[in-house]
Amino acid sequence: MRFKITLSYNGAPFCGWQIQPHAPSVQQSLNDALSTLLREDIAVVGAGRTDTGVNAIDYVAHFDYDKSIDTAALKYKLNAILPPSIAIKNIEETDNDFHARFSARRREYIYHIHREKDPFAEQFSYQYSYPELDFDAMN
């Protein structure tokens, strides 16, 4: 059976989504947590890669497992053992031909840029003061 996971994460403590040697990744954290809870090696497939420090909202991944799962209980347990920077929002059984990467219908990228120093925004945005940005040219 195939299971679809929707999650969000703060990418600050990670080298990105994809497993990298000698660096913490979101994928490795999820693999480890699922493998612990389901008591067998689980390999999660993600919708795509994110770079070091990049955050994700409603990121989709999938994994295969041969037994039936109480998805609500698994969500609760995953959120209890994963680092605080990763939040599982939903787990559901899906069709076996669903693929987190190849079944995606769209991806959306949001860039937060602020013009003045703001201690509350610095972790999740980029401060850019000069010169004036040309947003039309950026599109």
Where are the predicted features?
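Structured-RNA-binding interfaces characteristic of tRNA pseudouridine synthases
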Residues: 1-139
